[in-house]
Amino acid sequence: TLMRSSAASDVYKRQIYIESFVLREIMKKIYLSEVDSTNLYAKSNIENLADKSIVHAANQTAGRGRLQRTWVNLGEGNLFLTFVLKPSNSFNEVYSNLTQYLSVVLCKILEEYGLKPQIKWPNDVLINGKKIAGILSETVMQGSLFKGLVLGIGVNLNTSEKDLASIIDKEATSLNLEISKSVDVNLFLDKLAEEFFADYDNFLQKGFELIKNDYISRTCFLDTEICVQVFNDKKCGIAKAINDKGELVMSNNQKEFVLTIGDIL
């Protein structure tokens, strides 16, 4: 009797554990019908969000890109997502490569659709030379205290050509236009999150080295003459290489220089 009771108790405890585990996993995914920006929401609520949480919105009204650019709102049916990351170390140089890691993850998923995406350094993802996604990483501090990182991504999944025409400054595309059918946002989100976290912990240990070959093999504009906007400055020259830190190595008049940030024009 005691043995049967003990066994029953173990089964009960295991069931409670499974239920609490499932609940914990569900709680890690925050869904919002509309938000100004998933990154802003994540930053404002980071104290209450667990490590590896996901903030997903059906619609985003005030998204931002790198260098404080506005991310044009293309409405529902597209992916607006932020990963909430709270690694134990307050500083790790690999954090600056997280956007590049995510760009490689996204490329691999798009390749499953039969596409050939390219990465425009540092982290824009292009299809046939047209932008399909934007990525932005931000460090969250409270005074001098490190609170975590928010890594946001916007992917055009179901956008009409008319809506894309509203993006005046750059050519853009959407997955549905490239594959000629609509895309299930939730399935795409789940795949992206699964692939992102599959190697995330390994990436924190190894850094850019882990993705270097995958990144460089998909990088466009190498060995061509380009200009890069770096805040209010413009640097022009030949894009020579991507170094071991994920930085862009350029040369001008046989003088090499390295860029850690910028926007290829």
Description of each model-found segment:
Residues 5, 76, 253:
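ATP/adenylate-binding site constellation spanning eukaryotic-like Ser/Thr protein kinases
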Residues 14-115, 131-133, 140, 182-183:
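N-terminal lobe of the biotin/lipoate ligase/transferase fold
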Residues 1-15:
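Single conserved hydrophobic/aromatic residue that forms the stacking wall/gate
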Residues 5-9, 37, 174:
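Short linear Ser/Thr-Pro motifs
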Residues 23-24, 88-91, 97-117, 127-265:
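Long, positively charged amphipathic alpha-helical accessory segments at protein N-termini or as interdomain linkers
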